[in-house]
Amino acid sequence: MAGAGGGGCPTGGNDFQWCFSQVKGAVDEDVAEADIISTVEFNYSGDLLATGDKGGRVVIFQREQENKGRAHSRGEYNVYSTFQSHEPEFDYLKSLEIEEKINKIRWLPQQNAAHFLLSTNDKTIKLWKISERDKRAEGYNLKDEDGRLRDPFRITALRVPILKPMDLMVEASPRRIFANAHTYHINSISVNSDHETYLSADDLRINLWHLEITDRSFNIVDIKPANMEELTEVITAAEFHPHQCNVFVYSSSKGTIRLCDMRSSALCDRHAKFFEEPEDPSSRSFFSEIISSISDVKFSHSGRYMMTRDYLSVKVWDLNMEGRPVETHHVHEYLRSKLCSLYENDCIFDKFECCWNGSDSAIMTGSYNNFFRMFDRNTRRDVTLEASRENSKPRASLKPRKVCSGGKRKKDEISVDSLDFNKKILHTAWHPMESIIAVAATNNLYIFQDKIN
């Protein structure tokens, strides 16, 4: 189905409207490349929301306490911490520039008052600690209040330093740097359910790391052929199972997914399960292999299903059924007739991500023209919504959009020929427990929530 039906995307069977909550970022027409958002991620509680951009910065938003005095106040997200995660580098051995762009952010489950996250660019992964400080020590023996050393001859009494209140300060400090393990560009990182290890994947290899050890990683997948001329596919995404710490999956540019069990062997070159949908020979074309390349793979929270995103669709797979997906949701089927021009302008290589809602009953992914799509798995209804400042009045309901692929266009429909392919939503995130979503549109972060009447 091209376009959307229905008035909103339900997350359990009851329809509700999505409405505008907030938008972050400048309104400028000319957007600096460094300001373009490249990843979005809620933490496990949903109280923190992190974004990374092409300039190597990480911005963390914190949800404010709900204001009981204001009707329908749901708690807004405001800037909590901003820090430079990665800087541009140069590999002198290979004469290559290494971009500072943040490819992925992954939160670690919170163990104490501090928060920890992993961020990665093409080559280097960093573990960051985000902590608060609202007290400072005063009354040192050897230093004065400004930090200057005191004259030892003037120190006549022993002082015990005391803690005094100060304005709240949020500090982001790098605790570990994991480098020099990837020859190719890192496309995925995933924290294991044991909370001690994580994996990182590039085009040809997947490495397993311990969070405490930076100088050693274990290569668990290596698909690099002895002769690079024989290379037929690359790894596009990888993720650990949410509950079984020995199981992970990785997807390929050929549209296949391999599930591996680390208990079987140290090097998981032989998969435990192989997921692939048979190709329909009648629909084979020059673009078939390009559009079948998987750009994202995500396990459901339950661990029973996984979702993959290719160029035109989202597929849901049952881990017990390798032969075909149990669900196929068409994201923008109306673009199938435009593949030639999308190939010429390189849009056909765009990597769209996808995400589940907290109960695994709905899924979300992005499209062009700042549209994003939602699919309800229970009712089989879907909706197309738009992230736009034109709808940015507080509590304004999002109006479902429809795309017309030809013939007579109705009043509220948009022609496929008038879609703006420079405006694309590649990165989205869904709050783990509530109906709150975050959508990255170029340099702006939109936050939407369900409308409570």
From Swiss-Prot:
Stored Gene3D superfamilies: YVTN repeat-like/Quinoprotein amine dehydrogenase
Tissue note: Widely expressed with high levels in brain, heart, placenta, skeletal muscle, testis, thymus and spleen.
Location(s), subcellular: Cytoplasm
Residues modified to Phosphoserine: 285
Protein name: Serine/threonine-protein phosphatase 2A 55 kDa regulatory subunit B delta isoform
WD repeat windows: 32-71, 97-138, 181-219, 230-270, 289-327, 344-385, 420-452
Organism: Rattus norvegicus (Rat)
Listed GO CC annotations: cytosol; nucleoplasm; protein phosphatase type 2A complex
Family membership: Belongs to the phosphatase 2A regulatory subunit B family.
Function statement: Substrate-recognition subunit of protein phosphatase 2A (PP2A) that plays a key role in cell cycle by controlling mitosis entry and exit. Involved in chromosome clustering during late mitosis by mediating dephosphorylation of MKI67. The activity of PP2A complexes containing PPP2R2D (PR55-delta) fluctuate during the cell cycle: the activity is high in interphase and low in mitosis.
Any one GO molecular function term: protein phosphatase regulator activity
PANTHER family the record matches: PROTEIN PHOSPHATASE PP2A REGULATORY SUBUNIT B
One annotated GO biological process: cell division
Quaternary structure note: PP2A consists of a common heterodimeric core enzyme, composed of a 36 kDa catalytic subunit (subunit C) and a 65 kDa constant regulatory subunit (PR65 or subunit A), that associates with a variety of regulatory subunits. Proteins that associate with the core dimer include three families of regulatory subunits B (the R2/B/PR55/B55, R3/B''/PR72/PR130/PR59 and R5/B'/B56 families), the 48 kDa variable regulatory subunit, viral proteins, and cell signaling molecules.
Major location (coarse): cytoplasm
Signal sequence region: none
Positions of modified residues (Phosphothreonine): 308
UniProt keyword Cytoplasm, yes or no: yes
Residue numbers spanned by region Disordered: 385-406
Modified residues (Phosphotyrosine): 305
The organism's place on the tree of life at top rank: Eukaryota
